[in-house]
Amino acid sequence: MPLSKKSAISFIFITLLIDCMGWGLIIPVIADLVAELKHIPVNEASTYGAYLLSAFAIVQFICAPIIGNLSDKYGRRPILLLSLLGFGIDYIIQAVSPTYALLFFGRVVAGVTGASFTTASAYIADVSPDPTSRAKNFGVIGAAFGLGFVLGPALGALLSSWGIRAPFYAAAVLCLVNCVYGYFFLPESLPKENRREFDWKRANPFGSLKFLTHHPEIGGLALSFFLIYLGAQAVQSNWNFFTIYRFNWSEKMVGISLAVVGILIGVVQGGLTRIVVPKLGNNKSIYVGLTLYVIGLVLFAFATEGWMMFAFLIPYCLGGICGPSLQSVISGEVPPNQQGELQGSLTSLMSLTTIIGPLIMNGSFAYFTSNDAPFVFPGVHFLIGAICMLLGAIIAYSVLSKRPAKKMNAAGVPAMEPSVPSPNETV
């Protein structure tokens, strides 16, 4: 008996929740761990933290389209389980690592199998028949990440009192338990009749990016997508390093702040998105969300007290209504049997931002807190992020404002056009 769509969404929510808790556990301690292994101050350690993020992203960039195409051939379930197993192994390596080099190697291992977001996004697309439900269900992914970032950092902050490596062991256990749970309970979302053969041409990481230019709307919105995720790296890659340096935050305070981020993201993407998107439509949700992102980043840049970071998280996290709407518009342009390839391509774009972003954001932070800088400005990377978001908003508007009115329903949500793909269709 086929599972209901609601049950399928619940399965993927729980899977991503536990997976995200594992990553959230280690964020409060990773900055101090890198500083300890390299024997340098935390602002200098931010550069080495960027190398870890970039190493993971480079490998994921190469592997994501391969994983996406494999999920189109074999289904989402086995690929997702492999990803969880890889992350579990990565956390074990980091837990026992005596050197920065081994820590680096662990990130590479995780990059090879780091396809949970790619496969989960394709899974959501499989069980979401129309743009409105697709935007809402992509919001459920955000809610899982948000709740994971509430529980993960909070638990990581508590576990850090037992040692800087304790959160890594806990993260490994969570990922491996999640893998076992998924093996027994996670259903397959892609019917055999909607699968297609693996093709190395489609699995080429650079070739997969050409998929995004198959339709003009996808090409332009993909560039906006890239700039938005690049701007977000100002927060994602350097929050812990910045707050420890600027406000002398402890691991516990970093964990608490990230737990607050998780609560806000959960409220926005798990609840507010379901109310706002149907009323505003995808287009307006994108514009409003990006405006709030820019405001939040500019405020972060000039914060002078630690409490301000908590206050400024409100407009920044409210900007999260943008993401599900933008992804819904993009995914609505392709048929069901290409969703895995599309999500693999989008993940490749995200990986590119995680290759470039940390080097730019952490690098600018490290430089403007060093003796070589003409002046000290720790928040410079937030301004860079705001500029990226602003450019993304301009590009999104230029593309969406040219979309024919017949593609929009009464709610302002793009209506999906009929599409009958050939079984051997290639990009």
What is the predicted function of each stretch?
Residues 75, 96-101, 113, 248, ...:
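Helix-breaking motifs and short loop linkers at transmembrane-helix boundaries and internal kinks
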Residues 63-75, 268-282:
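Helix-to-loop junctions at the C-terminal end of transmembrane segments
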